[in-house]
């Protein structure tokens, strides 16, 4: 088999509709757009969300909530991700970025308790869940809030 002998799978290449090319084609004259009206015109049609003048859904529903501009966003990491470090390592947010465990530190790192930790580590982070603290200390490690 050579490159010029390759054929696309049956039905993979579909010919585009050629509209406005005579009545015999079935898509002549009005080109599948029906008779007159807004939708038959070039650039015709209504914007997304327009309901024909009826009060649209996005305006019938009440506004809710707000975005707290002072909210802190933490990079969350589960315990099982910390098993990549050697015993006795001091795990800091900078080290986590360096080892590509986390992409960005944001407002700090929060350690969550999903999974198990087999290594004895000293973990420094902004926040810890209760289960994460228990598991780190049970493995013989230390927890430091920074």
Curated annotation (Swiss-Prot):
GO terms for cellular component: cytosolic large ribosomal subunit. It comes from the Bacteria. Keywords: Ribonucleoprotein, Ribosomal protein, RNA-binding, rRNA-binding. Pfam families: Ribosomal_L27A. Signal peptide: none annotated. Transmembrane segments: none annotated. InterPro entries: Ribosomal_uL15 (IPR030878), Ribosomal_uL15/eL18 (IPR021131), Ribosomal_uL15/eL18_sf (IPR036227), Ribosomal_uL15_bac-type (IPR005749), Ribosomal_uL15_CS (IPR001196). One of its GO terms (biological process) is translation. Residues 21-35, 42-52 have a biased composition (Gly residues). Residues 1-56 are annotated as: Disordered. One of its GO terms (molecular function) is rRNA binding. PROSITE patterns: RIBOSOMAL_L15. Binds to the 23S rRNA. Belongs to the universal ribosomal protein uL15 family. Part of the 50S ribosomal subunit. This is Large ribosomal subunit protein uL15. The gene is rplO.
